[in-house]
Amino acid sequence: MSLIRKKGFYKQDVNKXXXELXKTYVSPTHVGSGAYGSVCSAIDKRSGEKVAIKKLSRPFQSEIFAKRAYRELLLLKHMQHENVIGLLDVFTPASSLRNFHDFYLVMXFMQTDLQKIMXMEFSEEKIQYLVYQMLKGLKYIHSAGVVHRDLKPGNLAVNEDCELKILDFGLARHADAEMTGYVVTRWYRAPEVILSWMHYNQTVDIWSVGCIMAEMLTGKTLFKGKDYLDQLTQILKVTGVPGTEFVQKLNDXAAKSYIQSLPQTPRKDFTQLFPRASPQAADLLEKMLELDVDKRLTAAQALTHPFFEPFRDPEEETEAQQPFDDSLEHEKLTVDEWKQHIYKEIVNFSPIARKDSRRRXGXKL
């Protein structure tokens, strides 16, 4: 089969992996690679801006890989908020569907992520600003009907101006059981996700924000469980062992009898648990690290907490204009059918001017 290539592309090895990039993007430099693909940075000749280019590894290897690739493309395309990573461009060197095997996602380049800088000592002002941005991003994602489910420091990208963007949202639902080589980080996960003990809603992500904020305050992972049971034990040491009202909501009979077998204990005093935290920070943490999903704050409610008063701008707390369309989510399609859908999206893609914050916080990492 002859591989006819489009004009305007060039081949280059980036960290021993062959990349075929549009000529608009120059000076590719390897950034990292993982189970799902590799990322390089490059300069967009048109704007002079640095971008991140992600090449998915073997997107059409199986139905699961192809479906995940389609979902990632659509999610990135849908999200248009300054605190959520979105799609600047998408391209393929293939000139037709027949020779379409790879595609590249272009996003804003961010210097680092929270995991890499967790050892820093964060001032309360920095914590306010970073957590405020996490919640703004989550309010937007949730308003589109998407739940992150796997929020952790490693998928919160930040730059030197303390601007934050949420990565890898909405992909976790496929990742756990189906993708090999994927390790679930349970430390930041809400107990109802780890244990499937009760219905869950969008506040699973708020629990994760609570864990991340606590770690920024103390420099230590809050709940570092060795396994699922140890994770639950560590959580209950902080939240207290809940009473009958909570236990009645549990769907899982084993979880129910386990909780009932434990002596009831009160919640720890958060001002003592987090001596560095201001009373408002401790109060917010207490409301985010709430075992009962019906009582836990939503992102929109958390944004109104007095802790964020110095940075709050309700005009920036926007919602998605329409819900994310996952109508193909439940379809059983072949690899070739997913491929057609993806190719069509790439061919029809037109970049949207992405707005960034109207103001600068003045905070530096």
UniProtKB/Swiss-Prot annotation:
The keyword Transcription applies. Residues 25-308 form the Protein kinase domain. The TXY motif contains the threonine and tyrosine residues whose phosphorylation activates the MAP kinases. Belongs to the protein kinase superfamily. CMGC Ser/Thr protein kinase family. MAP kinase subfamily. Keywords: ATP-binding, Cell cycle, Kinase, Nucleotide-binding, Phosphoprotein, Serine/threonine-protein kinase, Stress response, Transcription, Transcription regulation, Transferase. GO terms for molecular function: ATP binding; MAP kinase activity; protein serine kinase activity; protein serine/threonine kinase activity. It holds the Pfam family Pkinase. It catalyses: L-seryl-[protein] + ATP = O-phospho-L-seryl-[protein] + ADP + H(+); L-threonyl-[protein] + ATP = O-phospho-L-threonyl-[protein] + ADP + H(+). The modification Phosphotyrosine is found at residue 182. GO terms for cellular component: cytoplasm; nucleus. The modification Phosphothreonine is found at residue 180. This is Mitogen-activated protein kinase 13. PANTHER family: MITOGEN-ACTIVATED PROTEIN KINASE. The modification Phosphoserine is found at residues 47, 350. The keyword Ubl conjugation does not apply. Interacts with MAPK8IP2. ATP binds at residues 31-39, 54. Its EC number is 2.7.11.24. Serine/threonine kinase which acts as an essential component of the MAP kinase signal transduction pathway. MAPK13 is one of the four p38 MAPKs which play an important role in the cascades of cellular responses evoked by extracellular stimuli such as pro-inflammatory cytokines or physical stress leading to direct activation of transcription factors such as ELK1 and ATF2. Accordingly, p38 MAPKs phosphorylate a broad range of proteins and it has been estimated that they may have approximately 200 to 300 substrates each. MAPK13 is one of the less studied p38 MAPK isoforms. One of its GO terms (biological process) is intracellular signal transduction. Its cofactor is Mg(2+). A motif (TXY) lies at residues 180-182. Activated by phosphorylation on threonine and tyrosine by dual specificity kinases, MAP2K3/MKK3, MAP2K6/MKK6, MAP2K4/MKK4 and MAP2K7/MKK7. Activation by ultraviolet radiation, hyperosmotic shock, anisomycin or by TNF-alpha is mediated by MAP2K3/MKK3. Inhibited by dual specificity phosphatase DUSP1. The active site is at residue 150. Dually phosphorylated on Thr-180 and Tyr-182 by MAP2K3/MKK3, MAP2K4/MKK4, MAP2K6/MKK6 and MAP2K7/MKK7, which activates the enzyme. Dephosphorylated by dual specificity phosphatase DUSP1.
